[in-house]
């Protein structure tokens, strides 16, 4: 049994991606009530509500004894909770339960993609500290991307992601790869400046993006470093492999096609101005400044070699 918490708050959206959110809540609360003496279930009706609730928890207007917060949802909802906790300097740990199309960071936490199994796993999970990115004042747990990764997400949004789920990503990937939009960039990583032209650029904290693992052995969201990847726009094969999620790819061995630079402080400007995807939400534009906040967040993590 995991540690006993005094008062946990479980946040959820009605449109979380689960087939039946209320049935899902019933399954999840079975596990969470064994971890918390008191469990509050809080609906987030509008974007930004979770951040407001976190502010109320910080000011002890919600309750004076909250010592853990849970989220049932996809990466965008997780991102909102991360911002709520860090922006309000709320010194409480987080438990994440997958409930969206992609749940990249729950893979990093060794959690099952099934919400019911994942909530069961939380009972035997332990707290670990994770790095967080701060991007123009917004907190980001997993990745920052621009170029093809934004185009792909927008092509999905034009379709019916809510109905087709992951299937919608396949058609949009083909559409995206056939029409890449190039841009000029100036990227500074610590003291190193790079200039060039590309169709995709990614800065990763976590090792999983878009439903699959970045094939780079030493990528960790606990090492105090961020990893920038610049993709050669001419290398269609590599881009195709990246989007088709071929697990056999090893980016460590690729010298032509992907530039990889690790560092702690990043600035990025582009021409033209580009939209920026943060953890699946397209909410920023270039120029951006990114810094790593080492071990900024405590998150429940399932033991790596434990039985799923």
Swiss-Prot record:
A GO CC term assigned to this protein in UniProt: plasma membrane
GO terms, biological process: phospholipid biosynthetic process
Residues the entry annotates as binding ATP: 44, 74-80, 101
PROSITE patterns cross-referenced by the UniProt entry: DAGK
Entry protein name: Putative lipid kinase SH2167
A single MF term (Gene Ontology): ATP-dependent diacylglycerol kinase activity
Keywords assigned by UniProt, alphabetized: ATP-binding, Kinase, Lipid biosynthesis, Lipid metabolism, Magnesium, Metal-binding, Nucleotide-binding, Phospholipid biosynthesis, Phospholipid metabolism, Transferase
Entry annotated with the keyword ATP-binding: yes
Cofactor binding notes: Binds 1 Mg(2+) ion per subunit. This ion appears to have a structural role and is required for catalytic activity.
Cofactors named for this entry: Mg(2+)
EC number: 2.7.1.-
Family matches, as InterPro entries: ATP-NAD_kinase_N, Diacylglycerol/lipid_kinase, Diacylglycerol_kinase_cat_dom, Lipid_Phosphate_FormReg, NAD/diacylglycerol_kinase_sf, YegS/DAGK_C
Record-annotated DAGKc domain positions: 1-139
Function field: May catalyze the ATP-dependent phosphorylation of lipids other than diacylglycerol (DAG).
Family, per entry: Belongs to the diacylglycerol/lipid kinase family.
Domain of life assignment: Bacteria
Binding site for Mg(2+): 220, 223, 225
Pfam families: DAGK_cat, YegS_C
Family annotation (SMART domains): DAGKc (SM00046)
Active site as annotated: 281 (proton acceptor)
TM annotation in the entry: none
Entry keyword annotation includes ATP-binding: yes
PANTHER family xref list: LIPID KINASE YEGS, SPHINGOSINE KINASE
